[in-house]
């Protein structure tokens, strides 16, 4: 078992919308992942994956694009990754049916609303107490309006 607690989701969630750059319908599902998995995007239309890490960034003009050396690209990942970072999600599988994450409301808010409800388990199976002892809804209530 790892000395550092790692967080994942307690269940799966599916979101859909439109890709802001492609204009195409996009659907993604976020699922729990084991400790040390990290955030991994799985392209369902190509059966390949890309890990969200600095080395996979292939562009950041208008949208962040991730791509492994010989895998598919996934773009417009920045709002979803901001959601994971803000809520402390270390490990998740993100299945996406095309090349672009849906834009939803144009921010991370809808991702946060969906993910924070499932942020209940650590990768080791223990209960997640939340950031600084607060659960996600409590921490969010302390944020300034409009943040």
Language-model-detected regions and their locations in the chain:
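Core subunits and conserved enzymes of cellular information-processing
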Residues: 1-147
């Amino acid at each position: 078992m790892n000395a550092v607690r790692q967080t994942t989701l307690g269940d799966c969630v599916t979101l859909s919308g439109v890709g802001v750059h492609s204009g195409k319908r996009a659907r993604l599902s976020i699922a729990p992942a084991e400790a040390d998995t990290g955030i991994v995007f799985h392209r369902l239309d190509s059966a390949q994956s890309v890990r969200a890490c600095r080395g996979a960034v292939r562009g950041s003009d208008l949208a962040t694009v991730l791509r492994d050396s010989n895998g598919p690209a996934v773009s417009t990942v920045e709002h979803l990754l901001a959601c994971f970072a803000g809520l402390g999600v270390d490990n998740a599988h993100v299945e996406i049916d095309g090349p672009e994450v849906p834009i939803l409301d144009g921010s991370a808010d809808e991702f946060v609303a969906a993910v924070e409800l499932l942020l209940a388990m650590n990768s080791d199976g223990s209960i997640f107490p939340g950031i600084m002892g607060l659960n996600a809804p409590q921490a969010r209530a302390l944020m300034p309006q409009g943040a």
